[in-house]
Amino acid sequence: MGRSELREHIFRILFRIEFQPKEEMEEQLALYLEELESAKDTEKEYIRTKYAAIAEKVEMIDEKINASVTGWKTSRMGKVDLTILRLAVYEVEWDEEVPQGVAINEAVELAKRYGGEESPSFINGVLGKIVNSR
């Protein structure tokens, strides 16, 4: 499984945060990983570890997103866009294995696949502001 596919699985799990109580997310993660029958144990562990790292920093990530958008708050954003931003901001700010350009490009690709018509440009703009403010 390539990094893009792993990232997409992390996105799908992170998306559940918006709809599940926090205390149920560990069970949700286990159920999701159980369904990935073709995934290797190392891939499942990568997904689990990265999800946990992002979930731990969600509040800090949301603060960075809120500071980068004018007239928007994470509470008003579409859930798909917010989830993509959370994943990408984590990669830009804390994941040294992922180059910034790759994180942004992958986020835009996820937005094209799962978001609305304006999602790719919105995601690109927010991430650009975050990267430029570093």
Regions found by a protein language model. Give the residues of each.
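N-terminal interaction/assembly modules
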Residues: M1-P120, N124-R134
